[in-house]
Amino acid sequence: MKRYVLFVCLLLSGLAGVYAQSIAPFQKGDRIAFVGNSITCGGHYHSYIWLYYMTRFPDQRIDIFNEGVGGDVAEMIYQRLDKVFEHEPTVVTLSFGMNDVGYMDFRKPGADTIARNRVEKACRDYALIEEVYKKYPEVRKILIGSSPYDETSRFNKVAFPGKNTPILEIVDFLNARAR
């Protein structure tokens, strides 16, 4: 069984590059705004990127702006996006999806329909975000798919069965938009 799990993990990690954008490294002087929800706000991944650049390329200074806000959904990101551009970023990353699909609705009857409606709304709201992006053609945009949700965890004694499926639908949508 352990060999099977290891094989599946290796296979999936090998396929990850198939769906990834080809992203150029940050350049000296880049001003990167990481936009998203609480995963961006408190996830620290942007500080690891900054630290990597500072320790590996000390002569290539980059500036990082944490523009993550806990609880945000795509609509809320759209509503505050002009403020993000006040920092005059040269690169903007965007991640959303976890909050967009909701939480407690997955424990209710009709959860699939509710989730489908939430995914559709998130995609419509992303179209509004793209309209703002068009005002800044010189800014490089990077889409980051939401992290997966562990439906099997009992850490908080509350699981939301089916939550990962609509998150993956949003990730697939973003992958399609990135091409």
Model-derived regions: residue spans:
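Alpha-helical cap/lid subdomain in secreted, periplasmic
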Residues: 26, 47-63, 72-179
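Short glycine/serine/threonine-biased micro-segments
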Residues: 31-34, 66-69, 95
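Catalytic nucleophile serine of serine hydrolases
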Residues: 38, 68-70, 147
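N-terminal secretory targeting modules
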Residues: 1-35, 39-62, 82, 86-88
